[in-house]
């Protein structure tokens, strides 16, 4: 009887240890998932100011502009060059954020929404650069056209004055 009791206790203890080990494994998996989720949310919180800044940069490069003088266009061109310079200065922050996000994605427990945030960051960064460069090209082209128009207007004015001067001689 004593042996049966010992065998029964050993069986119960083995069973208990097995369940404990199994539960510990699940607990560790859950802890890893929670840690990955926490890091992902922390990353998206850190990403928010950069995303807002990129949106502002895009809006600076896409808002409607009206200019009809070379000097005004030149001022807008200088402002756009500053936007491009600011984008270039933020490149390090963008690269660090992108790298951090990609590193977080290597964790098998990383939440799926993290990839969409990284994709959106990359897409917006590319758009900000493209829009800023396109706007600068447009302004440079517009500046050349306005300078040519200004030169043509001066030539026409000179021709008109000459014509009027010659007409008054007759």
Protein language model annotation of sequence segments:
Residues 1-170:
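Extended alpha-helical rod segments
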